[in-house]
Amino acid sequence: MTAVETLGKLFAGPGAHDYLGEPVTIGEHMRQAGALAQAAGAERAIVAAALLHDIGHLRGEGDDGSRGGSGGSSRGASSAGDRHGEAGARWLSQWFGGAVTEPVRLHVAAKRYLCATEPGYLGLLSAEPVRTLVWQGGPMKPDERAAFEALPHARDAVAVRRWDDAAKDPAVAPPGFGHFAPLLAALVRA
């Protein structure tokens, strides 16, 4: 099975499940995020990262520590609560380079960063991201912010995070996974 077929199977199976109390399925959420990135004119790798940002959840690797995930990182961007980002990026790295995997890995850290640096951001979040923020480490401290800002893909992770936050609209019918398949196929490493 190719990378794109494997991903498509996840979107068709677990992607049809409820998404942590949100009004859309996890697959709809991820496809909405990819569509928002595409509509914003993001580079192909960033569209892929937005589409795949919660792939760790689709694979059952949640922030509660189930099915692996690394409990942290020496890079200053991780906490014990971002396992789905870490696990998803690690799994995706068998096919994609860092331009796709790093924003996936860092999208939880980006939430913590935005909570620390952007007044009012926390108030924009739905209930589940606010709840998980506590065990993801809370808003970043100054040293964590500096470490995050120094990461090569931090800006892309913040963009993915914003699309992640906006991609929960039950009135929006996102394109199907097949819409993104050619983009993903073009990004798969040979």
Task: Give each language-model segment a name.
Residues 1-190:
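Metal-dependent phosphohydrolase cores
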